[in-house]
């Protein structure tokens, strides 16, 4: 698998490429399956349909890896929190996690068992995915998941979380520890079900200043990485802490690949982290609106990363209104221009 070879710094015939959110709303085929499922969570829980949309970008675009179709918040959902997706406002937890009784009510054991639909999606996808294509599993980072659980949904300033961080840091650590233990078991079950690599998404890493991030954020990512690597040393682990270009000097851990978001100059990431880690990224997603912009973005990143271990990706998820033709063009151009 070219993607796995790249994760492990082995030579590849070209730079492998995939896109975050590649199974998504820009594809008419995805929208057709989602309409049949009824809503987003129903699609996540229907393993046959979830597998179908996981495979679509491989079949339609020719990406080098499929990424499991699911959501980072299925873990707190199956731990016992009430989650719904509201049109226009995203995920909402009807009873945010604010006290020890609510934390005690959440069950790690229940979550691992109740997420069987995810493992079934993985098994079915791996059966139908070409042998040379990797399947990436994933989870959210503990900090990012905790922000949703505590705030009750998305947030502009994370005021409730930060108040807790400064007023009751021990309780925030208790939440993060419990979420981390659930995620460790979840990722290990994904690997047993057949994923070839895993990615940890820390979408809201930039909400914390440097010292707080390494105490309440990255340290918990490394707990997951250490536990996974102890049991599955050959499974590549990708970390994607978004928006922390100022903290790169402090990044270390047993992971294999560091995902670079589009706001971080890839030259800076290369200087600080390569060749210790394979870099993944980091084209600005809106470049996909224009083939000329795609050409410029691809050329610049390939030129910067020439000779260094690299996986091509966007610096964040593909947007819902990107023309499919442009997404195809992007994938093909990366594969063509990076051919050794």
Curated annotation (Swiss-Prot):
NCBIfam families: hemE (TIGR01464). Its EC number is 4.1.1.37. One of its GO terms (cellular component) is cytosol. Its main location: cytoplasm. The record marks 71 as: Transition state stabilizer. The lineage of its organism: Bacteria, Pseudomonadati, Campylobacterota, Epsilonproteobacteria, Campylobacterales. Homodimer. InterPro entries: UROD/MetE-like_sf, Uroporphyrinogen_deCO2ase_HemE, Uroporphyrinogen_deCOase. It comes from Campylobacter concisus (strain 13826). It is found in: Cytoplasm. Catalyzes the decarboxylation of four acetate groups of uroporphyrinogen-III to yield coproporphyrinogen-III. It catalyses: uroporphyrinogen III + 4 H(+) = coproporphyrinogen III + 4 CO2. Belongs to the uroporphyrinogen decarboxylase family. This is Uroporphyrinogen decarboxylase. GO terms for molecular function: uroporphyrinogen decarboxylase activity. One of its GO terms (biological process) is protoporphyrinogen IX biosynthetic process from glutamate. Keywords: Cytoplasm, Decarboxylase, Lyase, Porphyrin biosynthesis. Pathway: Porphyrin-containing compound metabolism; protoporphyrin-IX biosynthesis; coproporphyrinogen-III from 5-aminolevulinate: step 4/4. Substrate binds at residues 21-25, 71, 148, 203, 316. It comes from the Bacteria.
């Amino acid at each position: 698998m070219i993607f796995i070879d790249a994760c492990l710094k082995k030579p590849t015939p070209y730079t492998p490429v995939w896109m975050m959110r590649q199974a998504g709303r820009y594809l008419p085929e995805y929208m057709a399956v989602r309409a049949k499922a009824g809503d987003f969570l129903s699609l996540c829980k229907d393993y046959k349909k979830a597998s179908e949309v996981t495979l679509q970008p491989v079949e339609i675009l020719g990406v080098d890896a499929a990424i499991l179709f699911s959501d980072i918040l299925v873990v707190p959902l199956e731990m016992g929190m009430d989650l719904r997706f509201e049109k226009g406002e995203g995920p909402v937890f009807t009873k945010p996690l604010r006290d020890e009784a609510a934390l005690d009510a959440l069950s790690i054991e229940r979550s691992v068992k109740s997420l069987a639909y995810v493992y079934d999606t993985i098994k079915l996808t791996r059966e139908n995915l070409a042998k040379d294509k990797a399947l990436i599993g994933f989870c959210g980072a503990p900090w990012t998941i905790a922000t949703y659980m505590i705030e009750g949904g998305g947030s502009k300033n994370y005021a409730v979380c930060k108040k807790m961080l400064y007023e009751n840091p021990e309780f925030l650590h208790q939440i993060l520890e419990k979420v981390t233990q659930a995620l460790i078991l979840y990722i290990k079950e994904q690997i047993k079900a057949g994923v070839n690599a895993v990615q940890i998404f820390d979408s809201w890493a930039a909400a914390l200043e440097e010292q707080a991030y390494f105490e309440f954020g990255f340290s918990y990512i490394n707990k997951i990485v250490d536990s996974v690597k102890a049991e599955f040393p050959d499974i590549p682990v990708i970390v994607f802490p978004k928006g922390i270009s100022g903290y790169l000097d402090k990044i270390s851990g047993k992971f294999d690949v560091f995902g670079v978001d589009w706001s971080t100059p890839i030259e800076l990431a290369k200087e600080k982290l390569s060749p210790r880690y394979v870099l993944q990224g980091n084209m600005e997603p809106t470049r996909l609106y224009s083939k000329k912009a795609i050409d410029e973005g691809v050329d610049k990143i390939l030129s910067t990363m020439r000779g260094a271990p690299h996986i091509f990706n966007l610096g964040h998820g593909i947007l819902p209104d990107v023309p499919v033709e442009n997404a195809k063009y992007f994938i093909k151009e990366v594969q063509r221009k990076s051919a050794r």
